[in-house]
Amino acid sequence: MPSLSDEQKRRVRALARSTSDAKIGKKLGLEPGAVKAFREQEAAAQRQRRERVFKILLPAVPLLLLLLCEALLRLTDYGGSLALFVPAETAPGYLKINENVGRRYFPALAVAPEVSNDLVRTAKPPGTYRIFVLGESTTAGYPYLYNGSMSKMLQQRLRDYFPDREIEIANLAMPAINSFALRDLGPELLAQQPDALIIYCGHNEFYGALGVASTESLGRWRSLINLYLELQQFKIMRFLRAQIAAVQKWFGPAHSPAGNANATLMEQMVGDQAIPYQSEKYRRAREFFTANLKDLINAAQRQGVTVLLANLVSNERDLPPFADIFNPVTPRATFLAALERSRQLATQGNLQAALALCDSLQQVDAAPACLHFQRARILEGMGRFAEAAAAYQTSRDLDGLRFRAATDFNHGLAEVAQATGAVLVDVHAAFTRASPHGLIGNHLLLEHVHPNLHGYFLMAAELCRALQQQGMIAVDWDQTRARPDSVYWQERGVTALDEEVAAIRMAVLLNNWPFVPRERSWPLRYQPKDYLQSLAYAMWRREQTWEKVHVLLAEDYEKKGRLELAVKEYEALILQTPHNPSPYIRAGLLYANLQDFDRAQDRMLRALALTPSLEAYQVVGAILLNRGQPAQSLPYLQKALQLAPGDGRTLYNLATAHLMLGQTEPARTCVAQLEKLMPGSAEVAQLRRSLASPQPAR
C-alpha cells in the first residue's frame, strides 16, 4: 500500500475530525485502507507519546504533592521559625537567639530548651570581635544561667582588656543537646561571621537529644541522623515528625519517664540505663562525638574562625556512681556484702584492711563502679591523693548510667584538637589545681556536672587566659587594664535572687531520679518566706521573666532605703541586657544618691550612648558642674532643657554654668525663666544677685 505524502497526511488530519475514512479516501483519491492504516498509525504514535509523558510525570507527582504541602505549610507558618537567629523586636539592628530553635532536637518530648537573650548586630561592624559559645547546660550556666554563665564572666574581663573595641559574645548553649545539635547549628552560626568559637560539650552524648541511649535516639547511623537534622528546614518534615511523635506517644508505654509530665527533662531523656564501658554503644557515642566536632571545627577553620575546645569536668569525689554493672557470673550479694565490710573497716580506721579487701574484690570483678569509689575513699583517707583521684575517675568511667563523660571523652577532645588544629583549653587541670588535694568535688560543683559560681568563675578565667596566650583579639594584651579577681567576683552580676532561683532548680533536680530512687522522688514543696523568695518562685514557675523580677526586687529595696542592694539588681540587669538604657539610668540615679559620682556619671554616659535621656543629661551635667567643669556641663544641660524646656533644676544649673563662664546674657535669660517658674525662690534670688556682680570666666 503506497505511503501518503506530507500534504495528504495534513489533509487527512484536518478531515478526520468530521469525515469517515471512506469519504476522505474518495475526496483525496486514496484507497480507504490507506486512510485507515494512517490513522491507526497516528493513534499508536499518540499512545506512545502519552505513555512516555506518563512515565516521566508519574515519579514527579509525589514530589509535586510534597512541594504543594510544603508551600501550604509555609503559607500558614506551621510550627513557626526554627532558625538559630531571628530579628530582635526590642533592639532594631540586632539579632537574638530564637527561643524555639531547640525544638528541632526533641520530636517526641516537644520541648524548647531555654536559650540566652544575648544579641549580635545584624550587620557585623568593622573592627568588632565576635565570639560564639557553644555547648550544653553547663555552658549555659545552669542552674544560675544569665550572669552566672562562664560567657558573661568572660565578657567582664574582656571589656576591661579592650575598652575601646566592641566584643560581642553570644552564648548559644542549650540544655539537653549534644554534638549533633552543635554540628547542625554550624552553617547558621558561621553565616554570622564569628571570629572565634568556644566549645564546652560532651556530657550529653548518651542521653542528650538524638544521643545513642536517649529516648530521642534515631538509630545507629550518624549520616542518617545528620541528614534528618538537615531536613528540618522543610516544614513538611516537621509536620511528619509531629505526627509520628503523636502516634508513638499514643501507643507508647503508659508509665514511661518520657511520657511523665512530672519527670525532670533529665529523667525523660534516658533510654538505656546500663551502658558498659567500651561497649559497642559506648564506642558509637564516642565516635559520633568526635566526628561531629571535627565536622564543625573543620567548617569553622575553612572560614578562618579560631576554635577553643575546652575539656570536661565532673564531680569525681563527692558523687557515688549511679549504676553498677557486674560480670554476669559475679555473685552480686556476696560481692556487695564484702564491700560493705570494707566500708565498716574503713569507718573503724582500719584502712589497710579495708583496702586489701577491695583489692581482693577487684580480682573477682573489676567492673562495678562502686568498688572503685570505695577504694578511692580509702586511698584518700590514707593520704594517697593521686591514687585516690585515679580511682575516683575510674569509678566515674565505669558508671553505667552515663550522665558524666568518661576520661576517654577528654582523650577524644585532645584527639580532635590535634587533628583539626583547635586550641585545647585544659579546664580539667584548672579544676584539679583549685580542688583540695586535687580531688574535684563539691568544692567546685553542685551535683554531677554543673559547677557552682566559683567553678564558672574559674572556667571564665581559664578561657580568658587561653584567648590571651593564643594572641586572639589582639597580639598584645595590656595587663595593666586587668583588675584583680576579687573585683570581678564582686561585680559578677549574680545576686541573692539568682542564687535563690538556682537553689530551687537544684532542689527539684536532686530530689528526683537518678539522685534518689523514683519511688522516693517528690515534687517541689516550696513556701516563700519573704519577697525575694516569692519573686524567685514566680520566676522558676515562669510567671515572671528574669528581667522583671530583678526590677521588682530593686524597686522594693529602694522603697526600703536599701540603695546598695537595689543598685546591685540594676547592675545585674546592665550585664545581662547591655542594650537596654533603663537599668543604666536607674543605677546612675542610685549612685548619685549614694554620692558615688564616678559610677553615676559612667552609667549615665553609657545610657546616653544608647538613647537620649532627660535624667541622664541632667545627672551628667550636674556632676560636671559640681566638679567645676561648667564648659563641659553645658552641652548636657542644654540637651536636657531641649527635652524638658520648663524644668527648673536644669534651668538653675544652666544659669550657674553660664555665670561660672562669665556668660551673663544666657544666664540672665535662664534666671528670668526661673523667676516665672519659681517666684520667691531664695536660690533664684541669689542667682539674680550674682548677675549684678558676675564672676570672672573659668
Segments from the language model and where they lie:
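Canonical tetratricopeptide repeat
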Residues: Q374, L552, R586, V619-V620, ...
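Short coil turns that delineate tetratricopeptide repeat
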Residues: P194, D365-A367, G400, Q544, ...
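Membrane/wall-proximal cationic-aromatic binding patches
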Residues: G79-F162, A434
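Helix-start (N-cap) detector for alpha-helical repeat units in TPR-like alpha-solenoids
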Residues: T334-F335, P368-C370, E547, P581-S582, ...
